[in-house]
């Protein structure tokens, strides 16, 4: 036996007896499976077997067998392993339950040949019913791995059923993404153009210009945008939503107690409003003790600290009421608990309550890091972030808050684990609340542009994700991780990727879709991204025949929508 010592107690058990291409698996892209959180008496069956590496051991409800965790926290080793190949994506799934205890964390861990542990996903398991555990791994080298269950309870006795590891090539994964994007981001619109007598108009020309996309890919900005006309022009020509990196934070607006200064934030907001750019508020408070104004930690009286904290909430939220799309009310309050330690366990929940009273229409986020990007995280895991939001919404008076999850997305400079990321988004999305990626970046590295595109496409292809903000900019902005343009505003390779995705996801109003109704069918169908459009219908032979109208294409309208246009001619 080998003991694990990595800073916290882990109990693990090796999965046994593997073979290829057999059994049952969960499709990681299935809408019916992706947000599944209920505990079921019997795991549902699936006919999905393509690309499957299947574990044959399945412990059923009426069996006396169970996988027991060694009480010493040791690994019980077996010799059999699974061979994984670099460049492939492996999606893991299993139905798990507890024989003893309840509501305990159960996760999957992959141990590589060099002894490194890769955490692949986790779930809260329950007693006497089955919960779906999902995750996965993207190996950076080919080799064999051992697969373990882990639990934070040394007394845990875990039963598992239908344990599977499904292999995808990157091309297969991308194809799945594209298919899902067509379902969740677009709808087919059929135009039927007729005269008042219902006779079809042959050869009508339909021009469609998008005025407001439903899904926004945005970018953060900082105070340097006030100092550079080139930065302002570069930004306004691309992005329709932003957040300010530091300019709205408490340690910026009140460096000295009682002396508030919102000059930079106000000026940046004015620039955004003048250019039709939405602003997401970041942040009212920050639960990290090191991220307070320097004078705040010196306050020893809890009543005094409460007074200045309430003053801060009232000040910033009243000032920007109705001007922002959302707020990080208490930033990173899963990782940190400064206000809870100083003011009580319900501090965060009570601050969300006050924020809701001050601006009930704004979306309020729990905003955390290492939730979707770092699979070794033990603090702000998807399960714990979900539970924090549930705790806030359960606080008296908070049930009507427009809640949302902010997954920051500070990725390491290496191949992202897309299978883990998708499973993490599934867990967060099971709340039924919007998810935004709020601070996406990655240190400079070879293939940065490839990795960033993979990350952004993974988010865009998930039904719970409603928008993305990257922490990036041109060289003059000082964003030294995701630099999108040089000092002359010429694109970097990563900048080319962002421009490509903006064009793909947000149809430019300067390049309208133009087509002619079919002379035989007298109707035309086009696939449109969800959003708002201006539509013009005219005819090249009839100069007086023209009509224009606004059109909103939404997911709620279904996969197909019929637009009937009646021409007065």
Curated annotation (Swiss-Prot):
Protein name in the entry: Endo-1,4-beta-xylanase 5
Tell me which positions the record assigns to the signal sequence.
Answer: 1-25
- Give the similarity note: Belongs to the glycosyl hydrolase 10 (cellulase F) family.
- Which gene produces this protein? XYN5
Q: What does this protein do?
A: Binds to and hydrolyzes insoluble and soluble xylan substrates.
Record text about domains:
The GH10 domain binds to xylan.
Q: Does the keyword Hydrolase apply?
A: yes
Recorded GO molecular functions are: endo-1,4-beta-xylanase activity
Task: List UniProt keywords, sorted A-Z.
Answer: Carbohydrate metabolism, Glycoprotein, Glycosidase, Hydrolase, Polysaccharide degradation, Signal, Xylan degradation
Organism encoding this protein: Arabidopsis thaliana (Mouse-ear cress)
